[in-house]
C-alpha cells in the first residue's frame, strides 16, 4: 500500500540507505559489476518490474515507489547534500602536479568545451525534436545543452579507477570533470534566470556573473583550503582533523551557496589544496591514513546511494514511441558533440597536449554523464517542456553509465600510453 502520510527525513533516509545496502550486497555477492553500475542496473530492473506489475493490475508497488520518490527532493539531496562531499573526496586524491602538466587540455575541455558542446547540442535538438512533434523554444534547448554537456565527476572518477586508462588520459578526464560541472551549473542557472524573468541579459552581465560565480568560487575554495591547511598543521590528532575536513566541506559549501559563489568549484579547489599541500606538509602518517579512509568510505557510500536513486527515478518518466526515438537520437547528438569538442581540441593542440595516440577515443567515450544532469533537469519549471527534457536526460545518463561506463575500459586498453597524439 502506498504511503498515506508524509515520511520524516529519518524514515526516508532509513529506507533509501537500507535499499542501497541490500543492492550493494546483491551486486557484490551475485553479479560482480562495479558498485555504482551494479546498483543502478538492479534498481532500474526493480523499477521496470514495478511498472510491469502495474500494467498487470498490481499497482501497489509502483504507487509506493512513486509516492516515496515524490517525498524526496533529488535536486536538493544531490546539489545541497551529496555534491560537496563527493567533489571534495574526488579532488582529494588528484595530483596537482599532473593537473598542471595537462592544464591546457583540461582548461579547454572544461571551460570552452562545455560552452561549445552546449551550443552544438542545443542547435541539433532545436532542429531534431520538431521532426517527432516535440518542438521546443531554443532557450529550452540551450538549458538542455548546459545540463547535459558537463561530464559528471561522480560518474567518471568512480569508473575510471578500474578502467585501465593511461595515467595522462585519466588525469585529463578527471580534471575536466571536476571543473566543468561547476561551469555547467553556472551557465544553467544563468539560462534558468532568463527563462524565469524573460529578460535577456547584456554580454557584460553574463561575463560578470560567470566571473563572480566561477572565479569567486575558485578563490573562495583556495582561501578555505589555506585556512584548513593551517588548522591541520597546527595539531596532530586524527579525530579532530577528520572533523575539520568534514566541517570545512559542509560549511564551506553552504557559505559559497549563500554568497552566490560556485560551491562545486570551491570544493574542488579546497580538495586539491588539502589533498596535495595538506597531505604532504600538514598531516602525520596516521592522520593521512584516517582522512583517506574516511573520505573513501564517504565517496563509496554516497555514490552507491546516488546511483540507486537514479535507477529508481526511472518510474517517474513516461516514454511514448516518438519520444523514445527522439531520446535515442539525443544520445547520438550528445556523443557527436563530445567528439567534435574533443576532436577540435586534440587536433588543434596536439603538439602541446602530450597525450597518447588515440587519446580522443577515451576522452570521447569516457565523457560520462550522471546525477548532476538529472538534478539540474529536475530544477526546471513543471510542464510539458520539462517532461520532454527529463526523458531525454535520463536516456543520455543511463546510456552513458551503463554502455559507456562498462565499455570504456576496453577502449582504454586499445590506447598505447607511450605514443603521443599525432592526429585523430
What are these regions (language model features)?
Residues 1-424:
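Transmembrane helical cores of multi-pass secondary ion antiporters/exchangers
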Amino acid at each position: 500500500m502506498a504511503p498515506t502520510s508524509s515520511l520524516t527525513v529519518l524514515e526516508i533516509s532509513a529506507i533509501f540507505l537500507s535499499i542501497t545496502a541490500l543492492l550493494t550486497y546483491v551486486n557484490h555477492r551475485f553479479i560482480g559489476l562495479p558498485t555504482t553500475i551494479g546498483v543502478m542496473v538492479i534498481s532500474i530492473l526493480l523499477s521496470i518490474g514495478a511498472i510491469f506489475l502495474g500494467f498487470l493490475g498490481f499497482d501497489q508497488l509502483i504507487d509506493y515507489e512513486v509516492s516515496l520518490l515524490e517525498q524526496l527532493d533529488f535536486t536538493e539531496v544531490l546539489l545541497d547534500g551529496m555534491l560537496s562531499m563527493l567533489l571534495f573526496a574526488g579532488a582529494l586524491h588528484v595530483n596537482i602536479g599532473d593537473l598542471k602538466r595537462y592544464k591546457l587540455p583540461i582548461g579547454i575541455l572544461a571551460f570552452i568545451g562545455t560552452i561549445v558542446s552546449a551550443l552544438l547540442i542545443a542547435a541539433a535538438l532545436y532542429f531534431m525534436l520538431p521532426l517527432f512533434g516535440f518542438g521546443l523554444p531554443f532557450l529550452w534547448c540551450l538549458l538542455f545543452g548546459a545540463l547535459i554537456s558537463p561530464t559528471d565527476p561522480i560518474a567518471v572518477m568512480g569508473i575510471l579507477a578500474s578502467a585501465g586508462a593511461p595515467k595522462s588520459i585519466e588525469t585529463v578526464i578527471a580534471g575536466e570533470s571536476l571543473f566543468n560541472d561547476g561551469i555547467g551549473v553556472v551557465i544553467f542557472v544563468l539560462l534558468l534566470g532568463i527563462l524565469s524573468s524573460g529578460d535577456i541579459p547584456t554580454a557584460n552581465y553574463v561575463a560578470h556573473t560567470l566571473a563572480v560565480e566561477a572565479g569567486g568560487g575558485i578563490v573562495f575554495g583556495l582561501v578555505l583550503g589555506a585556512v584548513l591547511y593551517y588548522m591541520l598543521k597546527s595539531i596532530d590528532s586524527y579525530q579532530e582533523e577528520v572533523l575539520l575536513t568534514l566541517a570545512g566541506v559542509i560549511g564551506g559549501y553552504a557559505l559559497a551557496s549563500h554568497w552566490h559563489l560556485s560551491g562545486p568549484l570551491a570544493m574542488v579547489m579546497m580538495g586539491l589544496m588539502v589533498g596535495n599541500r595538506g597531505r604532504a606538509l600538514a598531516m602525520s602518517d596516521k592522520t593521512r591514513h584516517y582522512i583517506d579512509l574516511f573520505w573513501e568510505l564517504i565517496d563509496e557510500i554516497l555514490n552507491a546511494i546516488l546511483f540507486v536513486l537514479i535507477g529508481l527515478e526511472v518510474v517517474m518518466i513516461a516514454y511514448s514511441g516518438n519520444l523514445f526515438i527522439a531520446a535515442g537520437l539525443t544520445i547520438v547528438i550528445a556523443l557527436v558533440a563530445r567528439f567534435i569538442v574533443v576532436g577540435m581540441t586534440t587536433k588543434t593542440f596536439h603538439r602541446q597536449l602530450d597525450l597518447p595516440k588515440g587519446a580522443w577515443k577515451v576522452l570521447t567515450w569516457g565523457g560520462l554523464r550522471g546525477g548532476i544532469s538529472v538534478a539540474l533537469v529536475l530544477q526546471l519549471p513543471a510542464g510539458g517542456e520539462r517532461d520532454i527534457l527529463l526523458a531525454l536526460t535520463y536516456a543520455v545518463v543511463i546510456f552513458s553509465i551503463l554502455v559507456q561506463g562498462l565499455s570504456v575500459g576496453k577502449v582504454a586498453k586499445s590506447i598505447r600510453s607511450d605514443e603521443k597524439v599525432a592526429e585523430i
